[in-house]
Amino acid sequence: MNDQKDNKEIQTIVPLNQKTNLNELDAKAIYDEFQKLNKYQRAFAWLKLPKQKKAELKQFLNKKKTQVDLLKEDFNHANVFEIRNFNFWYMNRTKHVLHDLNLDIKRNKVTAFIGPSGCGKSTFLRNLNQLNDLIEGTSHEGEIYFLGTNTRSKKISSLELRTRIGMVFQKPTPFEMSIFDNVAYGPRNNGINDRKILEKIVEKSLKSAALWDEVKDDLDKAGNALSGGQQQRLCIARAIALEPEVLLMDEPTSALDPIATAKIEELILELKKKYSIIIVTHSMAQAQRISDETVFFYQGWIEEAGETKTIFIHPKNKRTKDYISGKIG
């Protein structure tokens, strides 16, 4: 399909203008429209559907015993990730850095990874979206399930996985382009080229990242001309422009001042209403402030995992208690 036809089909499904009245479309009609799109546009359109229409479509799919091709997601899966006996090596298996990890990560929660430097928490984070696969000499054993599907199966490509799992790094990494183009970059790569649709995506993403009011009159300004805190929120907006299921954050506030850090933390608490968020942090105070669940890593092992209040107030593991109290680091 050409771009003009693609955009017309998407507008049939997504309520992007007043001419579209989704209330008049039944589940079968929506399903039929989905089949006209490529897989990336299908995923985008699905994520923009109102909850009521999603529910109707699920009912229809259950009756037909089939699913829209959206990574074959289990719609009722309680955990966003399930890790089973996972091991990871660098340097052609000469450096064993993650050992027999088993962990369930819940949906729509903030999960904090804590532990001393070099304990494996960032390495593990980058295995969730297969970024470590880009490093020569790495290998792994065990399984990582994303919404019930093994991420190493042929059902999910690395590209599809990274579309559904956004990433925000320690240092803000805006592209050398305008604010608008930074946020529109992912949707464009996934086949969304209509200017009006992109404008709506950019506005919504910047609003979700609490940045719109600060930059709405300067969207042509270079992204790297923003302040450090604004750049990090721009990177968050860019990550959520594709409506991912998960946001991975690798020490997202470590390079920011206290005021910018507070804004990011406030934003995370708002974003968890829609996304599952996993954050690596060296700040135990930050983990206590914003996370629902905490995982303590030590020398490549998971020492303890559970509700944040329990981990910090009544840890079961002596090593966890020693780390939290500052006896080890």
From Swiss-Prot:
InterPro entries, A to Z: AAA+_ATPase, ABC_transporter-like_ATP-bd, ABC_transporter-like_CS, P-loop_NTPase, PstB-like
Any one GO CC term of the record: plasma membrane
Keyword Translocase: yes
Enzyme Commission designation: 7.3.2.1
Cited NCBIfam families: 3a0107s01c2
Oligomer and partners: The complex is composed of two ATP-binding proteins (PstB), two transmembrane proteins (PstC and PstA) and a solute-binding protein (PstS).
Family, similarity comment: Belongs to the ABC transporter superfamily. Phosphate importer (TC 3.A.1.7) family.
Full protein name: Phosphate import ATP-binding protein PstB
Species annotation: Ureaplasma parvum serovar 3 (strain ATCC 700970)
Lineage summary: Bacteria, Bacillati, Mycoplasmatota, Mycoplasmoidales, Mycoplasmoidaceae
Gene: pstB
